[in-house]
């Protein structure tokens, strides 16, 4: 067995993925898998993770359900594009009870980018220049759909595009640093990997570690059993 990582474990995070194609199985939900792995690796606990339809009632229900658990962070992906079925932006504005303003400077920069690419910009793209009066926008270095940031009660809500490579860069540049900066009272964790022994044997061998000061997790696979030991000290 060997130790393979050291991390922190504290913040509660919930995830809402929005998209009919995700529910129908037409698109693999890689965003959920990637975000879950990332926030866990920096020391967060996934409180809940759900996928909802591109419909106002479904989105609101998903947000409300996750917020009941009072996570420190709620991460939302999908539905920020310019088409009619991209409802997330306007639904969030209503949910947060905020008006929006039109960012003429951003619209000007989008028109310039499209012109450089020799492409015609559609009026539908104007929706991506809307800015909440109560909230913030998050820069998107790889696309036109900027993210959003809100605070509801004690939960910080980040809304990101569903396009994986856009979402990942925005998470790494804006979301991850924010979470790490706000971490308090961290729990240290180590993962030990074993081979050639069963999960039941591992459990019987180390179950007395699992007292009030330690949290033990067992993760069996075809290669062996990983043991995650977490402790505040």
Name every feature range the model reports, one short phrase each.
Residues 12-50, 54:
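Glycine-rich phosphate/diphosphate-binding loop of Rossmann-like nucleotide-binding domains
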Residues 18-20, 76-84, 161, 232:
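Glycine-rich beta-strand-to-loop/alpha-helix junction loops that act as flexible
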Residues 51-59, 199:
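Short acidic loop-to-helix transition motifs that present clustered carboxylates
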Residues 58-61, 86-182:
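Proline/glycine-rich low-complexity loops and linkers
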Residues 61-69:
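Short, well-structured alpha-helical segments in soluble
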Residues 69-96:
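Glycine-rich phosphate-binding loop
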Residues 151-232:
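Accessory alpha-helical/coil subdomains and C-terminal extensions
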